[in-house]
């Protein structure tokens, strides 16, 4: 969406393509970790299982490197292309987008390495499951990770020219609009190096704060409790979303369900018809007394009505 927003539709499709490999790799790798921890999903209850899950560790490392845009992996080619294209718009909006893109890439690297380090490094923190009960996943689960890791490493390099290279017009065949003055512009070296440098720096920074010196974060919790709670609750976006969208949708749905579905459709439709048929069948059942003289009397009344009709006509 970032790339499409700055008009880099071909880059957006390229990132969607590379993103599929390393994001799927991370999702399936997370599943392998959850399997090892017997369905535990909180990374605060993990840690120190690098040697217990060696293959999952390697695949998650590859996926994390690719996601953060580490140089020469798939994410590096597509992520940098997005930021570069925003910079080349040569406008205030383009510069703003490029700045936000660089900051986002750095923060993405921080939280990605936080996930990786707290899962595999540091001390083991699960009190319910002994570390000797954690185990590597079977080959049937690891095989897809292997193939996805190949794409996470090489897909960006081998398909860059096809999607966004100088001859990419031949691939898109006019289906995507290109700004030629942007496509053939140059980018200063410092800008090209800025994002990769920040991505690489995020590795020791994350390890320092989340593994080596966790007391810094503990101190931050104590001294900045309101801010910490605000961040811990994800800016209360979920609660705000509930108030603005979920709860009103529930009320509207409940109204139409009770007044429309139950109050009208069911009342005059299936439920109403079935009740009417049941009532008529109960009335008809009153004539079935089981006594011969009642049936003979009914036949006599019917015969009298029939004869009267014939005589009158």
Predicted feature locations:
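Hydrophobic, small-residue-rich alpha-helical packing segments that form membrane-like cores
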Residues: 1-88
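Divalent metal-coordination and catalytic microenvironments
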Residues: 19, 46, 75, 116, ...
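Alpha-helical transmembrane segments of polytopic integral membrane proteins
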Residues: 27-30, 39, 70, 79-80, ...
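Aromatic-capped, Gly/Pro-kinked transmembrane alpha-helices
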Residues: 165-197, 208-313
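Predominantly late transmembrane helices and immediately cytosolic-facing juxtamembrane segments
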Residues: 23, 27, 95-133, 169, ...
């Amino acid at each position: 969406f970032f790339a499409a927003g700055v008009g880099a539709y071909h880059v957006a499709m390229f990132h969607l393509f590379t993103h599929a490999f390393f994001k799927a790799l991370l999702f399936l790798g997370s599943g392998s970790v959850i399997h090892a921890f017997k369905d535990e999903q909180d990374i605060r209850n993990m840690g120190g299982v690098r040697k217990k899950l060696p293959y999952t560790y390697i695949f998650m490392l590859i996926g994390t490197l690719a996601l953060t845009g580490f140089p020469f992996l798939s994410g590096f080619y597509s992520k940098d292309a997005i930021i570069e294209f925003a910079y080349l718009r040569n406008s205030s909006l383009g510069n703003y987008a490029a700045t936000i893109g660089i900051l986002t890439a750095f923060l993405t690297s921080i939280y990605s390495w936080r996930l990786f380090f707290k899962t595999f490094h540091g001390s083991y923190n699960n009190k319910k499951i002994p570390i000797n009960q954690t185990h590597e996943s079977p080959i049937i689960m690891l095989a897809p990770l292997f193939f996805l890791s190949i794409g996470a490493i090489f897909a960006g390099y081998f398909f860059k020219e096809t999607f966004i290279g100088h001859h990419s017009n031949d691939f898109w065949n006019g289906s995507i609009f290109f700004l030629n003055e942007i496509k053939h512009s140059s980018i200063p070296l410092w800008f090209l190096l800025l994002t990769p440098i920040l991505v690489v720096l995020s590795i020791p920074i994350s390890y320092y704060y989340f593994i080596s010196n966790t007391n810094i974060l503990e101190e931050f919790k104590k001294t900045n409790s309101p801010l910490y709670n605000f961040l811990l609750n994800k800016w209360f976006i979920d609660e705000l979303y509930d108030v603005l969208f979920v709860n009103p949708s529930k009320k509207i749905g409940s109204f139409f369900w009770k007044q429309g579905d139950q109050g009208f459709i069911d009342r005059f439709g299936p439920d109403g018809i079935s009740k009417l048929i049941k009532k008529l069948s109960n009335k008809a059942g009153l004539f079935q007394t089981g006594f011969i003289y009642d049936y003979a009397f009914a036949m006599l009344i019917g015969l009298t009505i029939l004869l009267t009709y014939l005589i009158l006509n």
